[in-house]
């Protein structure tokens, strides 16, 4: 309520009110750092893993067993040997190798706790289209990373020559009270198909550092099994309230009629709309569909 009152003349207050009603709360005691590329982000991620004292949680759509993952895995394995709890949650479609029973058993044999989010077997599962596209790394409940970077060489511009040229994506590091929401999101995903629901309490820090930074942080995430499209609602609100410009970067442009009409209307009322997409596609069909929209 205090945050909403302080921002009563700002569109941010509407978003805060909406998110709070969906149980995603604003935090002021936070520090946020932006990484403009995967190659900038990677060493910070390794450093954060190496700093862990209690636990490390990873939730990723794509984890590819390549040289980048080997470096991450070795850093995680060393922490396990030091007594740090490591949990890995990967998507059954996005991480086909890690999702195999062989690799899951390999992780568990090395002391990891690991689960697969909706395996693609059976193929005709009613949940097949519910995928976990999150990219979250949490260390000790005090620090979290999120953004567009999966765990694969191409995202970090590492390994052999990248067939997609330079991969441009980004990530953010969050420290402070907002990490609470990332813990909540991860543990809810972890417990989705569990027989016994765990108590979250032991993973919640008793205190956080003091971060004298301006602004507020509101992490949020869509629920996998309800009809609320929180992220879409927020994007539509931002588009429809833009006054000067809209800068959009995305690996894929797959928009429905509603979003397309809102973007066209924004441009028609004088908003400068700029959209940046990759020149070299990693999924040709998706690229062609997106190009059809951009050519309209």
PLM segments and residue spans:
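A short, conserved beta-strand element enriched in hydrophobic/aromatic residues
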Residues: 169, 249-250
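A short, polar/proline- and glycine-enriched secondary-structure boundary/capping micro-motif
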Residues: 154-159, 259-260, 286
